[in-house]
């Protein structure tokens, strides 16, 4: 079931470096929220705090709260692995497991979670590949390596792998940056379908993509070089692109900087 995300006074650090300051935002269930902003402004850093992926970097930590339907993901006793099971991640570059078949790539997370019944795994594989709009393209070659697919197909395979464990939220960090225009369009169409089942947050440098796929857009920026990134404003995508409140947002969207 898709869930609501809320951050409260979220500050993010890498050791003594203050990367992002005081982020307060809400992402409603079954919506797509786009994070936009210039390179280095902290949008991917914020994305990774939503499932505690930033913690894999030594010295990284955050203060404030990240809540999933009111439950603090950084609360005492909360298992980071369980968080990442509920809040899936698709990375910038497709990263299928090259030594695994297409089928085994999709069900890898389920196997890690203890599912051993082959019938259940086969059903989950088909359901997830259909959910990623990939089933018809690969159903006759499920035992081939995931690395044998094209770049766009590999990214959809990674999406299938992420949704196979039935997360409540799906995070996407520039999922189209390495893809050709046709593959990009396929991913964008898929994002629009995924929000029927999941809460989706996507980082993108492509303004047209943000306008096409998202319901809500958050603009991040730096005060100055060496200063923390910050959330400048968040609003419906229509308002952000037609009538933003902040001049910095308008300047970025119109290409005056960034």
UniProtKB/Swiss-Prot annotation:
Molecular functions (GO terms): ATP binding; ATP hydrolysis activity; ATPase-coupled phosphate ion transmembrane transporter activity
Enzyme class: translocase
Record: residues binding ATP: 37-44
GO process terms (BP): phosphate ion transmembrane transport
Protein name, per record: Phosphate import ATP-binding protein PstB
Stated role: Part of the ABC transporter complex PstSACB involved in phosphate import. Responsible for energy coupling to the transport system.
Family of this protein: Belongs to the ABC transporter superfamily. Phosphate importer (TC 3.A.1.7) family.
Alphabetized InterPro entries for the sequence: AAA+_ATPase, ABC_transporter-like_ATP-bd, ABC_transporter-like_CS, P-loop_NTPase, PstB-like
Membrane topology, record value: Peripheral membrane protein
Record's subcellular location: Cell membrane
Ranges where the ABC transporter domain occurs: 5-247
Assembly, per entry: The complex is composed of two ATP-binding proteins (PstB), two transmembrane proteins (PstC and PstA) and a solute-binding protein (PstS).
Alphabetized PROSITE patterns for the sequence: ABC_TRANSPORTER_1, ABC_TRANSPORTER_2, PSTB
